Each structure stands twice: as C-alpha cells, then as structure tokens.
C-alpha cells in the first residue's frame, strides 16, 4: 500500500519514486534542523548533526551512500592528522579524484537529466566542505601577516575532534544541496560563540519569519517549475519541428528552457535556506547595534531577481549558487593569483574549469563553464567602456548598461543549454540552430576590447588659484 501511495504521489507531480523519496527527506531537513535547537549539550549537538545527516542519507540513497561519503571525509581527516602542511593540497586532489570517479561510474548527469537521483549531488557538496576544512587547518599554521581576510576569518588553529568533524560534514542533511559553510562557523554556532553568543540583553534572533519566507518562496518556485517544464522539454532541441522554426522562435525556446530549468534550483536552494535558517546557523548578524532586525544571509544560495535581472554577467556568481561561488573564489580563484599580481582571464578560466569538473565530466558542463568565462570577461569589457564615458553623457552610459543586460540575457541562456542537455551532439545542435550567437558575441566583444582599449574617466580636481 505504501509503495502504491509513493507511486501515485510521484506520478502526480511527474517525478520518479526515487526523486520523491529524496524530496521528502530533503524537506524533512527543516523539522530535523529545528529540533537541533533543543539538543542540550555541545557533544549531543554534534552527535545529532552527524546521526540525522547519515540517517537522511540512508533513507534517500541507501546504505551505500554513507560509505561513499566516508571516503572524502576520511581523506580530509587523515590528511589533517598525518601531514598538516599539505593537508589542503592532498584533500583537494584526492577528494576531487574520488568525486570524478563517482561521476563517471554512476553517470550521474544522465541520471539527473532523465529524472533520476543518486548520492553524487550530496557528495559534491561534501567534497567542498572537507576541502575547505583541510585548507583552513593548513592556513592555521601560517602567520596572519599576508593572509587575506577570508583566510584570517576561517583558519583553524586546532584540529577539530572526530565527532565535530562528522557533525560538520553531515549536519542535519545540509550536505544534500548545501549551502556550503565553514567549519569555524559550525563550531561557533554549536558552542554559541561569535555572532551566536547570547547578547548582553539576552536577545536571540527569531528565525521563524525568515524561514516562512523561504518556504513560501520554495512553494512558488516548485509550482512554476511544474507548470513550465511540460511546455519546454529539452528533447525539443533535437526534434525536426524545432529546426523548422525561425531564428527568433528557436532562440526564444532556448531562453524559456533555461528559464524553466532555473526554477528547479530556486526551489532546492530555498528549502535548504529554510533548513539552515530554522537551525540558527543561517544567522549572519544584526542590521544595527540596537539589534532590532536579524540578517539571515549565511543560508542564502540564490537571489532570484538578481539572476533574472542581472545588469552584468559579472553579477551572476554573486546571485547564483552564492555559497559555491564564494567557495570557488576563496579556495581556487584567489589562491592561484601570484602575490602582488591582479587576477586575469587565466584565473577566471581555471576557476570555471574546476567548477565544470566538480559538476561532472560531461561535454555540456565543460562547454557551459568555458562559455561562462568568455561571457564574464566580455561583460567586463562592456563595463569598462561604460565607465570610460564622461558623466555628462549619461544617456550613452545608460545605453551601454542596457547593452550589457541584453548581452547577459542572450549569452547566459544560450550557454545554459549545454548545462541542461549535457551531450556534445545536442549542445552543438542547439548552438548551431541559433548560429552560435552566444559564442560569437563574447569573442567579438573581447576582440573589440583589444582594438578599442579604454580607461575610465577620472574626475579632475580643481586647481587652487
């Protein structure tokens, strides 16, 4: 009877039983995170965090999932215990190697594309968490002088205990879809230190309003996704009818396919945000010294309006998968820039390549993230032209702002086809159908930026007479 109910429930929302089981466990992270608040001791909180995360993993993916999770967790902890000076390096490369192996073995991208589910998505989040923990423990050996602010804030002087480490990795199912957070934040939250310390007024932030907002947002996102997805199937890209359409209709379909797919991620991240908020970990401070309004940005992984209305492609990482973008900036982008040098296209491309490999070795992922590097660099060029225009020519500046917005819309939704369909053939068929417009435009903009280099106009200071 239970199986029949699961089958009927899954059919009613157009997903498989495996996906429905995952969704139920994923939503259950909200009440489970809420109960964390009532666990009396630090040790109890760590045990509850680890046990609840492992149990939800078992219900969602089966017993083997926890065995998979143990591998990067063991790599990270062993590297910290055995050879601290290279613990971050060891965990980064071995953790990614195991993740890539799982991606290849399970062909996870194909499973997700066909509506299936497996534990590799959670393994992706977990891999980032163990890497950041190891790198921060490595940073704890270094002198503060010369460290970036993020390194100073997140570095670990002492090695976390095994139960603290397990609690951090599996915390109430937060490894399902993120957001990625730091070990130091987890420890301070558990021990009620830092911003989580009870204030002199004895005031604690109430998470309920922010949690309800996140749940309401998730419901809207799911409703929109379920409404749109039957109307814009990805299979249409290789159907003869698609090729019979005119250019504008084909490009419009690409835009709507990307727009539709994003609502699935908006839903997932809204639920994970609600879960982290209700636990208290999502608290990020007060808006002012009077402690009248709490901020809950630590749990935020997406700004929907920010993504859909981004004025520049440079803003996309600030609004989309925010915590992973932050992780990539702190642990890849900033660390491959030589001291005293500025980051350039190479650092951007290397960071996007790491992001592509993290998602899986599908051609569509690689193409998307290489495209996104071109997109961002092209957007920077347009912005430089915009800044070079004198303030008195405000109309022309606004025209370039509009051009940058349209550029971002066109290139982002064109590029996202690869992320959705994954295969090289389907990606190239879709790109060819719109004459590779999203590849040609960024390259043309970048070439033009070399031919027409500009410097921002600086306001002149008046000379004293």
From Swiss-Prot:
Q: Tell where it localizes.
A: Endoplasmic reticulum membrane
- Which tissues express it? Expressed in rosette leaves, pollen grains, developing embryos and developing seeds.
Ranges in a coiled coil: none
Pfam families for the chain? MBOAT
| Annotated TM spans | 15-35, 55-75, 86-106, 161-181, 214-234, 266-286, 356-376, 399-419, 434-454
Q: Is Lyase given among the entry's keywords?
A: no
- A molecular function (GO) term: lysophospholipid acyltransferase activity
What happens in the null mutant?
Answer: No visible phenotype under normal growth conditions, but the double mutants lpcat1 and lpcat2-2 show increased contents of very-long-chain fatty acids and decreased polyunsaturated fatty acids in seed triacylglycerols.
**What is the active site of this protein?**
359
Keywords associated with the record: Acyltransferase, Endoplasmic reticulum, Lipid biosynthesis, Lipid metabolism, Membrane, Phospholipid biosynthesis, Phospholipid metabolism, Transferase, Transmembrane, Transmembrane helix
Q: Which domain of life is it from?
A: Eukaryota
Where is this protein chiefly located?
A: endoplasmic reticulum
Which Gene Ontology terms of cellular component type are present? endoplasmic reticulum; endoplasmic reticulum membrane; nucleus
First-tier enzyme category under EC: transferase
EC no.?
2.3.1.-, 2.3.1.23, 2.3.1.n7, 2.3.1.n6
Instruction: Answer yes or no on keyword Aminoacyl-tRNA synthetase.
Output: no
Catalysed transformations (reactions): a 1-acyl-sn-glycero-3-phosphocholine + an acyl-CoA = a 1,2-diacyl-sn-glycero-3-phosphocholine + CoA; 1-(9Z-octadecenoyl)-sn-glycero-3-phosphocholine + (9Z)-octadecenoyl-CoA = 1,2-di-(9Z-octadecenoyl)-sn-glycero-3-phosphocholine + CoA; 1-(9Z-octadecenoyl)-sn-glycero-3-phosphocholine + (9Z,12Z)-octadecadienoyl-CoA = 1-(9Z)-octadecenoyl-2-(9Z,12Z)-octadecadienoyl-sn-glycero-3-phosphocholine + CoA; (9Z,12Z,15Z)-octadecatrienoyl-CoA + 1-(9Z-octadecenoyl)-sn-glycero-3-phosphocholine = 1-(9Z-octadecaenoyl)-2-(9Z,12Z,15Z-octadecatrienoyl)-sn-glycero-3-phosphocholine + CoA
Q: What does this protein do?
A: Lysophospholipid acyltransferase with broad specificity. Mediates the conversion of lysophosphatidylethanolamine (1-acyl-sn-glycero-3-phosphoethanolamine or LPE) into phosphatidylethanolamine (1,2-diacyl-sn-glycero-3-phosphoethanolamine or PE) (LPEAT activity). Catalyzes the acylation of lysophosphatidylserine (1-acyl-2-hydroxy-sn-glycero-3-phospho-L-serine or LPS) into phosphatidylserine (1,2-diacyl-sn-glycero-3-phospho-L-serine or PS) (LPSAT activity).
* Family of the protein in this entry: Belongs to the membrane-bound acyltransferase family.
Q: How does it assemble?
A: Interacts with GPAT9 and DGAT1.
**Which PANTHER family did the record assign?**
LYSOPHOSPHOLIPID ACYLTRANSFERASE 2, PORCUPINE
What is the name listed in the Swiss-Prot or TrEMBL entry for this protein? Lysophospholipid acyltransferase 2
- Specify the species: Arabidopsis thaliana (Mouse-ear cress)
């Amino acid at each position: 009877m239970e199986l029949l109910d699961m089958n009927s429930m899954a059919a009613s929302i157009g997903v498989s039983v495996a996906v429905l089981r995952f969704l139920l466990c994923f939503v259950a992270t909200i009440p489970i995170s809420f109960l964390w608040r009532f666990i009396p001791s630090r040790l109890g909180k760590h045990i509850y965090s680890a046990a609840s995360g492992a149990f939800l993993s078992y219900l969602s993916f089966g017993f083997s999932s926890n065995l998979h999770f143990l591998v990067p967790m063991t790599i990270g902890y062993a590297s910290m215990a055995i050879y601290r000076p290279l613990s971050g390096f060891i965990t980064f490369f071995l953790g990614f190697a195991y993740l890539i192996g799982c991606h290849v073995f399970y062909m996870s991208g194909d499973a997700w594309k066909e509506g299936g589910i497996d534990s590799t998505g959670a393994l992706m989040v977990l891999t980032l968490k163990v890497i950041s923990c190891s790198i921060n423990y490595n940073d704890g050996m270094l002198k503060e002088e010369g460290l970036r602010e993020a390194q100073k804030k997140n570095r670990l002087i002492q090695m976390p205990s095994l139960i603290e480490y397990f609690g951090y990795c599996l915390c109430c199912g937060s490894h399902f879809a993120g957001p990625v957070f730091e070990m130091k934040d987890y420890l301070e939250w558990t021990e009620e230190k830092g911003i989580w310390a009870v204030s002199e007024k004895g005031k604690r932030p109430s998470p309920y309003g922010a949690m309800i907002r996140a749940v309401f947002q998730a419901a809207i996102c799911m409703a929109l996704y379920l409404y749109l997805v039957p109307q814009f199937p990805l299979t249409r890209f290789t159907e003869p009818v698609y090729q019979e359409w005119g250019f504008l209709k084909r490009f419009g379909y690409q835009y709507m396919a990307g727009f539709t797919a994003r609502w699935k991620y908006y839903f997932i991240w809204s639920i994970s945000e609600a879960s982290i908020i209700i636990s208290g970990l999502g608290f990020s401070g007060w808006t002012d010294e009077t402690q009248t309004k709490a901020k809950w940005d630590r749990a935020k992984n997406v700004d929907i309006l920010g993504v859909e209305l981004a004025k520049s492609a440079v803003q996309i990482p600030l609004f989309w998968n925010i915590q992973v973008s932050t992780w990539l900036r702190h642990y890849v982008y900033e660390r491959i820039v030589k001291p005293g040098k500025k980051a350039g296209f190479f650092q951007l491309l290397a960071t996007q390549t790491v992001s592509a490999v993290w998602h899986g070795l599908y051609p569509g992922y690689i193409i998307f993230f290489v495209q996104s590097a071109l997109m961002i660099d092209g957007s920077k060029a347009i912005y430089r032209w915009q800044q070079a225009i004198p303030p008195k020519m405000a109309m022309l500046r606004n025209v370039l702002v509009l051009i940058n917005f349209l550029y971002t819309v066109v290139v982002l939704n064109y590029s996202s086809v690869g992320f959705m369909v994954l295969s090289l053939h389907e990606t190239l068929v879709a790109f060819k159908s719109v004459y590779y417009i999203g590849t040609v435009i960024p390259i043309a903009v970048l070439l033009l930026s070399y031919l027409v280099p500009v410097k921002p106009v600086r306001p002149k200071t008046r000379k004293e007479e």
